[in-house]
């Protein structure tokens, strides 16, 4: 979001979301979506060939880092070229851990292997994502999960889909029945962030039915959009891990704010994405953590 459109100091009276307004490029963005889907599916296939649930485990930090970089290099070779051809004037964000607002205009913000750490350890929660950001608003995204063949998509103003079927958040309205999730955004967070994570998890465990801690964020946000879990919160402003899922949740009809209830944007320091009927109560839980 541009500098003149920073988040509000107080929560608005209406349902807060960073995705309000008409998308003047809805038709154009919708026409672009199949190209983006093809790109993430192709990149996903290249990474699926490298996946094994049992073999080739890294034996230390250096091996972990090398495996992550090797996977990234394979995926980006399949992802970058078709997206740059489709939108040659759009910028490209290479740094998957980058934070904060982008310069004006259009940018591709991919996560060439979201959940790379899971992939190299033989676990199943990983995907390939690509999101088009226009003037700091996500307007189009595709998230492909190669192990299941599922593809989540969203266009601002056009709804969120899973393989062509429209997504909706859960219908739950009581915290005591809620299934919620959080997770670490990246290695090496500061001590204050770890303390907030721990305190918020304790607060949630005292309020909801079940709380899950897992990575990556995109998978859990997609589950919120699909009504499979009821909320996700994270003390993070890493762009590539949040943009795709935030758009999916918003277009599915969920609430996407920071943990104080202000509209979420790339200027936000944290995120809460939830089914609408639980959002206010979840804010109250997180208000105990500062």
Language model regions located:
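Residue-level signal for inorganic ion chemistry
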Residues: 47-50, 79, 83, 116, ...
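A glycine-biased, small/acidic residue-tolerant capping/turn segment at secondary-structure junctions
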Residues: 54-58, 125, 257-265
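Short glycine/threonine-rich catalytic loop with a Thr-x-Gly-x-Asp
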Residues: 93, 119-122, 213
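Short loop/edge segments at beta-strand edges and connector loops
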Residues: 94-96, 164, 215
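DPxDG-like acidic metal-binding loop motif
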Residues: 102-161
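Short loop segments at secondary-structure junctions
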Residues: 133-137, 147, 156-159, 165, ...
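An extended, acidic
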Residues: 168-290
């Amino acid at each position: 979001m541009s500098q003149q459109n920073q988040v509000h100091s107080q929560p608005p009276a209406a349902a807060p979301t960073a995705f309000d307004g008409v998308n003047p490029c809805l038709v154009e963005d919708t026409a672009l979506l199949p190209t983006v889907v093809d790109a993430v599916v192709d990149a996903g296939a290249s990474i699926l060939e490298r996946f094994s649930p049992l073999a080739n485990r890294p034996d230390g930090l250096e091996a972990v880092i090398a495996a992550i970089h090797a996977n990234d290099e394979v995926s980006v070779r399949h992802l970058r070229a078709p997206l740059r051809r489709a939108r040659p004037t759009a910028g490209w964000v290479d740094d998957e851990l980058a934070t904060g607002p982008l310069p004006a205009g259009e940018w591709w913000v991919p996560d060439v292997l979201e959940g790379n750490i899971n992939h190299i350890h033989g676990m199943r929660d990983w995907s390939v994502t690509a999101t088009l950001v226009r003037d700091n608003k996500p307007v189009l995204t595709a998230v492909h999960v190669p192990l299941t063949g599922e593809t989540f998509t969203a266009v601002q103003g056009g709804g969120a889909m899973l393989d062509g079927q429209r997504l909706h958040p859960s219908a739950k309205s009581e915290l005591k029945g809620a299934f919620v999730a959080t997770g670490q955004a990246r290695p090496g967070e500061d001590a204050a962030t770890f303390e907030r994570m721990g305190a918020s998890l304790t607060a949630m465990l005292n309020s909801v039915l079940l709380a899950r801690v897992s990575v990556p964020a995109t998978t859990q946000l997609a589950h919120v959009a699909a009504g499979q879990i009821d909320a996700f919160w994270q003390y993070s402003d890493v762009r590539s891990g949040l943009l795709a899922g935030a758009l999916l949740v918003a277009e599915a009809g969920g609430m996407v704010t920071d943990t104080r209830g202000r509209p979420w944007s790339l200027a936000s320091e944290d995120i809460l994405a939830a089914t609408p009927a639980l959002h206010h109560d979840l804010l109250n839980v997180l208000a105990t953590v500062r």
